Structure formats: structure tokens, C-alpha cells
């Protein structure tokens, strides 16, 4: 009986550690990245639906367009019918090169911080990008950059792009901890 009694503090400590680890699972390095990637500028196109969303309230696209087989809309209503390489019509119609929905494999809608972190590093879900490719994509891609220049009446992600890239670099250089 004595060995069990001596083991109780260790058992209790391990159990407590297990309880705490799930609540502390999110890496502090990933927290600001999650905050940006779950902002409407990102989630409206990284949606888990068969249609794009728009606005900060993330309503269904006004023209009722659908994803289409190639994520560029249905054959009779492609994204490029309205969305050009830059914002047009007094910034009412947003635009950037290769305007399209992210593939469903890149849907972030509804993911927890842990799930999104894991998905970002999953080559089958992220466009076959390693962490450095992901950093380059989020630093240089014109469609990503549009999120920080969305035109009037559209909010921007919570960090300036330069700061986001700095924070993303810290996360990448640390090995992408979740």
C-alpha cells in the first residue's frame, strides 16, 4: 500500500499536466497568425462552403455565385467577370490578380487554432507548401496582399502586413509550433 501512496503525488501531477496541456495547446507564436487568418478578409475566400462570402459579417456573395470545379466560379459566371486585377468601381468591386476561392482543402472556417496550425503545415491541404513556401506565399502573393488594401468600407486584418510577416517568420523559424 505504501508504494501506491508514494506514487499518488506523481499520478496527480501527471493528470494535472494532462488537463492543463489541452488548454495551453496553442503556441503563443501561432496566436497572432490565427487572429489574422480568421479575419473576414481571409475567411471569406477560405470558406468551407460552395460559395464565397463577403463583408465583415461574412454574408453569402450578393450575386449568388458558386465555387465551380476550379474554384473560379461556375462556367457562366467566373470570378473574373467582375473581379479584375485591382479594385474597381470606386473600390466597390474588390480585385487582385488570380481572384478565386481557396480550394476546399484550404478551408479554414470553423477550425480551432490547433486544427488551423496543423492544416497550414499539411502539404496535402496547403498547396504543397513547406513552411518557407508558406511564408513566401503570405509575404508576396498579390491576392494575400489585397487583404491589407481591400478598398473602402472593408476592414483590414488586425496587424499591418509587415508586422504579420514578421510574426509569421518567427513562427516559421521556430518550426511552426502548434
Where is each model-derived feature located?
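N-terminal, post-signal-peptide region of Sec/Tat-exported proteins
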Residues: 43-75
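Short, well-structured alpha-helical interface segments that form or flank functional binding sites
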Residues: 28, 40, 74-77, 163
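The canonical Cys-X-X-Cys-His
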Residues: 38-49, 76-86
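N-terminal export/targeting leaders of redox proteins
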Residues: 2-34, 54, 65-70, 87-178
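Short amphipathic alpha-helical surface micro-motifs
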Residues: 25-26, 61-62, 82
Amino acid at each position: 500500500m505504501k508504494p501506491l501512496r508514494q506514487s499518488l503525488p506523481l499520478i496527480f501531477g501527471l493528470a494535472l499536466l494532462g488537463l492543463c496541456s489541452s488548454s495551453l495547446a496553442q503556441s503563443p507564436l501561432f496566436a497572432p497568425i490565427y487572429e489574422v487568418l480568421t479575419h473576414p478578409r481571409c475567411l471569406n475566400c477560405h470558406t468551407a462552403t460552395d460559395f464565397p462570402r463577403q463583408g465583415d459579417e461574412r454574408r453569402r456573395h450578393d450575386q449568388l455565385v458558386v465555387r465551380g470545379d476550379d474554384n473560379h466560379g461556375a462556367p457562366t459566371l467566373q470570378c473574373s467577370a467582375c473581379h479584375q486585377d485591382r479594385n474597381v468601381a470606386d473600390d466597390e468591386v474588390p480585385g487582385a490578380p488570380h481572384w478565386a476561392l481557396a480550394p476546399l482543402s484550404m478551408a479554414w472556417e470553423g477550425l480551432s487554432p490547433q486544427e488551423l496550425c496543423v492544416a497550414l503545415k499539411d502539404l496535402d491541404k496547403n498547396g504543397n507548401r513547406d513552411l518557407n513556401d508558406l511564408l513566401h506565399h503570405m509575404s508576396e502573393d498579390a491576392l494575400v496582399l489585397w487583404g491589407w488594401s481591400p478598398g473602402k468600407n472593408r476592414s483590414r486584418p488586425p496587424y499591418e502586413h509587415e508586422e504579420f510577416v514578421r510574426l509569421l517568420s518567427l513562427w516559421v523559424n521556430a518550426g511552426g509550433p502548434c
